[in-house]
């Protein structure tokens, strides 16, 4: 009798937990305000002051850039003069211009080698124009490049490279010269775009706004929500600030399994389960080895030494394994079981894809 009561209490607790609403999140984490976004800038420039690690003679455009720069300062080089030097590197400069930034403010820039420079460490980016997609100049970049990697090479040709020495950043390296206009202040309404489109989330956002401010929010699809806003710019900014603090129930999200095919990383969201399934998986490995045999002719035979290539191909068939799981098994437990058998990331991915094709995964499989 006591055990029956305990089982009833446990079942009631589980039902209560399942009936709880999804965790509410601030609206600022769910939506973007239309017209308030970053704008990408890009430019071409040169980095000088390198310790012999710049572009080699095969890169012609870096030498041409040096000649054009000297010409702007009134220095005309003789015709057919080779202006390619190893302490200069041609680079592409990119930056992200946040919304609302005004003239005189600074932003970080990323500097990346365009030629065959070995390292940008110790270099200085000369004044570079940063343009948007419309071709207009919005910022000017210049400064010392900060590199997180290194590269060293000995006289024998041996070298070592840590991280990426051909790309770096310049903190606060660009000054804003032109503001990007925004349509945030225009019209009698604002638009909110869900970062992850969902009909349920869009409906919950509209209900939450209308519950607090009256019938001012509408939606037509799973992404865009239109909200009537004050016409005065100061009041509109304060209104959006209040909206961003409002908590909204996002609803139930689709369970996902994300697999990175390059690194073998598997990320499993909460709620992913597997239906009854059995999987048999075997591994096939092909090994190709190359070696060279030297054929030496006999003395006084007027023959020549020949190098004969020798290729060996081996095919190894691994022992197949059978896996069987009951209904409702956690996918995390399944992957742990497969990993304990010594399976590689490719094996895990093959099993996940097979389960997904069989309709055994209660969730969405995403491969990146």
UniProtKB/Swiss-Prot annotation:
Instruction: Please state where this protein is localized.
Output: Periplasm; Bacterial flagellum basal body
Signal as UniProt keyword: yes
The Swiss-Prot or TrEMBL record describes its family as follows:
Belongs to the FlgI family.
Asked if rRNA-binding is a keyword of the record, the answer is no
Which InterPro entries has this protein been placed in?
Answer: Flag_FlgI
**What role is this protein assigned?**
Assembles around the rod to form the L-ring and probably protects the motor/basal body from shearing forces during rotation.
Predominant location: periplasm
Keywords, alphabetical = Bacterial flagellum, Periplasm, Signal
GO CC terms, sorted:
bacterial-type flagellum basal body, distal rod, P ring; outer membrane-bounded periplasmic space
Annotated coiled-coil positions are none
Q: Which Gene Ontology molecular-function terms are recorded? A: structural molecule activity
| PANTHER family according to UniProt | FLAGELLAR P-RING PERIPLASMIC PROTEIN FLGI, FLAGELLAR P-RING PROTEIN
Assembly, in brief, is: The basal body constitutes a major portion of the flagellar organelle and consists of four rings (L,P,S, and M) mounted on a central rod.
Tell me, what is an example of a GO biological process annotation in this record?
A: bacterial-type flagellum-dependent cell motility
Q: Which Pfam families match?
A: FlgI (PF02119)
Protein name per the record = Flagellar P-ring protein 1
Q: Span of the secretion signal? A: 1-24
- Which source organism does the UniProt entry give? Chromobacterium violaceum (strain ATCC 12472 / DSM 30191 / JCM 1249 / CCUG 213 / NBRC 12614 / NCIMB 9131 / NCTC 9757 / MK)
């Amino acid at each position: 009798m006591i055990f029956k009561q305990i089982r009833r209490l446990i079942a009631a607790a589980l039902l209560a937990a399942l009936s709880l609403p999804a965790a509410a999140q601030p609206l600022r984490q769910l939506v973007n305000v239309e017209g308030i976004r970053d704008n990408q800038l890009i430019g071409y420039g040169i980095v000088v002051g390198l310790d012999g690690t710049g572009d080699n003679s095969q890169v012609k455009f870096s030498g041409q850039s040096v000649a054009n720069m000297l010409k702007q300062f009134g220095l005309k080089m003789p015709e057919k003069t080779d202006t390619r030097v190893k302490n200069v590197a041609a680079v592409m400069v990119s930056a992200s211009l946040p919304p609302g930034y005004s003239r005189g403010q600074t932003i970080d820039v990323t500097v990346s080698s365009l030629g065959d420079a070995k390292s940008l460490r110790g270099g200085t980016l000369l004044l570079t124009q940063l343009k948007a997609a419309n071709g207009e100049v919005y910022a000017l970049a210049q400064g010392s490049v900060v590199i997180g990697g290194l590269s060293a090479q000995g006289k024998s040709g041996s070298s070592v490279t840590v991280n990426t020495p051909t790309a770096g950043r310049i903190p606060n390296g660009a000054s804003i010269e032109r503001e990007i206009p925004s349509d945030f202040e225009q019209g009698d309404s604002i638009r909110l775009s869900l970062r992850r489109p969902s009909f349920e989330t869009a409906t919950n956002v509209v209900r939450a706004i209308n519950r607090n401010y009256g019938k001012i929010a509408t939606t037509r699809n799973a992404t865009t929500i239109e909200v009537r806003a004050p016409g005065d710019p100061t009041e509109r900014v304060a209104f959006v600030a209040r909206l961003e603090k409002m908590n909204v129930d996002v609803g139930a999200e689709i369970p996902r399994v994300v697999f990175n095919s390059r690194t073998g990383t598997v990320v499993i969201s909460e709620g992913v389960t597997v239906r009854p399934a059995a999987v048999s998986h075997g591994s096939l490995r092909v090994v190709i080895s190359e070696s060279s045999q030297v054929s030496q002719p006999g003395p006084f035979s007027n023959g020549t030494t020949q190098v004969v290539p020798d290729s060996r191909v081996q095919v190894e068939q691994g022992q197949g394994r059978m896996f069987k799981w009951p209904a409702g098994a956690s996918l995390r437990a399944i992957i742990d079981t497969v990993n304990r058998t010594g399976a590689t990331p490719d094996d895990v991915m093959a099993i996940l894809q097979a389960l997904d094709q069989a309709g055994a995964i209660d969730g969405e499989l995403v491969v990146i």
